[in-house]
Regions:
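Long, charged N-terminal interaction/targeting segments
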Residues: 98, 120-121
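Extended, well-folded interaction surfaces typified by the phenylalanyl-tRNA synthetase beta subunit core
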Residues: 124-127, 136, 147
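Active-site pocket-lining/capping segments in soluble small-molecule metabolic enzymes
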Residues: 1-113, 131, 139-239, 246-277
């Protein structure tokens, strides 16, 4: 993940084969975690000089007005030399194919692909890769891989935050804080501290868990799959994705390095059934 040019360099220097990032519009992250067009061009040059790739996120669900601005944004990104667009909306997919036909298109996890039929349909529509819904099990992934064309690349998230809703399709932030999660502005109310109250006992708040500060009753545990990266690879995953474009340099460097080490350990002896980090 790369929230800016410096974090992109950290990701590459600590072992990433490819980096994903976004422009100020269409990228599912608020302003501080995006690139200017000039930074994107410079970063693509930096990555390509080191044999790495840059994928541009365009995975919001655009309004009618935003859709009018898609062609220019796509052509600008193509001029910068990005290696693929990551999209969630069918209109964006079509626009990418129309205005940058030579650049690969990946379907974002926001698309909510949870089965082989959806993945196969994505391939027929021109997707080079699908980023699977984070809710899929290893068995689900293996079945999907077995029933889809081998040319279709499979990508899965292996580390980072998990949304309480299926693949981020959540309106809680919009409802409670007026901040649209589908515009990269999630306030993460699922991580706030909540108490239980009973309507006939106003003012009496009950802890749901054992934590004296309240209990996190909505959010899922964060994802960490490094200890069983071998099982993910054996299920048929081609690309491992780390969440965190808005995270710190330290996070990008340390997590990228950890998964680089885990993946290299597996690839050094993929036939070993007793994989350990």
């Amino acid at each position: 993940p790369a929230g800016d040019a410096e974090r992109l360099r950290y990701a590459i220097n600590y072992g990433a084969d490819a980096v994903y990032c976004g422009l100020p519009e269409f990228g599912m992250r608020s302003a501080p975690a995006n690139f200017t067009p000039e930074q994107l061009t410079e970063s693509v040059i930096y990555a390509h000089a080191r044999g790495r790739k840059v994928y541009l996120t365009m995975n919001t669900l655009p309004t009618n007005e935003e859709a009018d601005r898609l062609p220019e944004a796509i052509k600008e990104a193509a001029k910068a030399g990005v290696d693929a667009f990551i999209v969630a909306d069918l209109g964006v997919l079509d626009a990418c194919k129309t205005f940058a036909p030579d650049i690969d298109v990946h379907l974002s996890t926001q698309t909510g692909i949870t089965n082989w039929a959806a993945a196969r349909a994505a391939y027929k529509m021109g997707a080079k890769r699908v980023v699977l819904a984070r809710e899929m099990t290893l068995q689900d992934i293996a079945i999907l891989r077995d029933k889809t064309p081998p040319e279709l690349e499979i990508e899965a998230f292996v580390h980072g935050a998990m949304c309480m809703s299926v693949s981020g399709r959540c309106l809680l932030s919009n409802y409670m804080a007026g901040r649209d999660a589908n515009r990269g502005q999630c306030a993460q109310p699922c991580r706030w501290k909540y108490y239980l109250s009973e309507e006939t006992r106003p003012g009496q708040l009950y802890e749901i868990g054992e934590n004296e500060n309240g209990s996190y009753i909505l959010n899922a545990n964060d994802m960490c799959t490094a200890p069983f990266i071998d099982l993910i690879c054996k299920a048929g995953v081609d690309s491992l994705k780390i969440e965190g474009r808005a995270k710190t340099f330290y996070y990008v460097a340390s997590v990228t390095a950890a998964y680089r080490k885990a993946l290299d350990a597996y690839l050094a002896d993929p036939a070993n059934d007793n994989f350990e980090l």
